[in-house]
Amino acid sequence: MSKVIGIDLGTTNSAVAVLEGKEPKIITNPEGNRTTPSVVAFKDGEIQVGEVAKRQAITNPNTIVSIKRHMGEADYKVKVGDKSYTPQEISAFILQYIKKFSEDYLGEEVKDAVITVPAYFNDAQRQATKDAGKIAGLNVQRIINEPTASALAYGLDKDDDDEKVLVYDLGGGTFDVSVLQLGDGVFQVLSTNGDTHLGGDDFDNRIMDWLIKNFKDENGVDLSKDKMAMQRLKDASEKAKKDLSGVSSTHISLPFISAGESGPLHLEADLTRAKFDELTNDLVEKTKIPFDNALKDAGLTVNDIDKVILNGGSTRIPAVQKAVKEWAGKEPDHSINPDEAVALGAAIQGGVISGDVKDIVLLDVTPLSLGIETMGGVFTKLIDRNTTIPTSKSQIFSTAADNQPAVDVHVLQGERPMAADDKTLGRFELTDIPPAPRGVPQIQVTFDIDKNGIVNVSAKDMGTGKEQKITIKSSSGLSDEEIKRMQKDAEEHAEEDKKRKDEADLRNEVDQLIFTTEKTLKETKGKVSDEDTKKVQEALDDLKKAQKDNNLDEMKEKKDALSKAAQDLAVKLYQQNGGAQGAAGQAGPQGGNPNDGNNGGAQDGEFHKVDPNK
């Protein structure tokens, strides 16, 4: 089996790793960075991903950031020109880019991947992530939870007795807490809890809001109405947040941010760590509820926890580290890089799948309860949250009315007692139930959750044996036809990108050849015959014309012709120079001898120091 890469598809940044030998290794992107911004931009018909997309976000309105926050939303679309893109398609552009530079690094085609998701992602969000992988041309071998992946990275080389580990994962846009038990190569998730709409972006926004308010109070100008100013504020806020992880105060300077009646306006502000902590205190406190719930669901207290692992770039915020230390009663473990741990863990799981890693078993859980709607709009659970997956559970239900010919199976995910308050995953009908009094027919409903957390549901009439099955696609799931269409679009974009790169390479080669040929003609003037230089000059003029006409086919043809003519000229020049040197060699005091090694030919020989006084 070929290499299985591990991808941390993050809200703000993504990372990819692969198992080399027994160790997972981060694959750097073309810029040499170990993480890649999860940013996609559309510019002049070209799709840009990563650093280049993020850099021009200020000037390009067709730039998409934090798309992960919208995974699983059925009606969410990104409109670019006259075309709309789903979150799955935007994510696929990021995955496609990661796939490409991973292939460049490995020197082979990458087909298989393990992709991570926040532990608290529901079925719709997981399915959307898997669909994004398919669109990007990846066979998604496994979807695993981010905290579980970081625990794999932490625990790979640990041979200690059983450890209970709490993973506090605060990323760019999502937050999870998971409790795991590690021992003898078994990584068992005991519980998970979180908030899929809380992360570092929210901390950035607090700084932005503070800057906007202060600027409005001082200058009477509302920067929130200015899109370009907002992008500059966003970048400055993110930088200030990062700075305050290392220093107690930072200066924010944004010259010419706006203009007033008296001329240009500049934003200058000093932000202390104390003020930042004050602005974001409620966000930090908001993470305490999932922290407590994860411990409660695992049946543990903080005293039972052996290690606390911090994961996600936002855990570098000092107030976050301080809070976790206070809540857990112990110093968090800093042995793994919070930006890279998830990708490294995903690569380890990839190694398990490919057979390169032995003696590791990953037992994950479903984050939310699953069940169906029953009479009175009640949500009846079949599988409780934090159940180890894969799993299967069946329960017998019956009809609610006499002679009821069909039952509507409404599949839900959540924790609320009433169906209306929970998340609909899908619904289907079991029809042709024979007439019978209410409560007599026996309908067996079975839930299956696979290793990726994807749900399959079936309903079977025990009397007739008739059965109806569905794989829950959820309201946001894509059909096979839609995925195939999007795969084709992605492939076409890849072909377009290659064509565009080939064109750019050709133009660069033409420019370089014209420059070097003109230089050569100047340098060889008078050294070779006019007839020889005329051929090169004509070929040069032909290429310049093709370049001016922007005719790519002609440019390629004329480039090859000029290359040949220039090469012929270089050969003649070399022969003339060689001949001159040969003649000079024969003009020695002894007249030369064909066997004395001075005949101008290249042959083996010994070199001796010559004494000029002899």
From Swiss-Prot:
Pfam families: HSP70. Residues 481-505, 605-614 have a biased composition (Basic and acidic residues). Residues 466-505, 541-562, 577-614 are annotated as: Disordered. Induction: By stress conditions e.g. heat shock. Residues 577-597 have a biased composition (Low complexity). It comes from the Bacteria. The modification Phosphothreonine is found at T174. GO terms for molecular function: ATP binding; ATP-dependent protein folding chaperone; unfolded protein binding. Gene3D superfamilies: 1.20.1270.10, 3.30.420.40, Actin, Chain A, domain 4, Substrate Binding Domain Of DNAk, Chain A, domain 1. Keywords: ATP-binding, Chaperone, Nucleotide-binding, Phosphoprotein, Stress response. Acts as a chaperone. Belongs to the heat shock protein 70 family. HAMAP family: DnaK (MF_00332). This is Chaperone protein DnaK. It comes from Lactobacillus acidophilus (strain ATCC 700396 / NCK56 / N2 / NCFM).
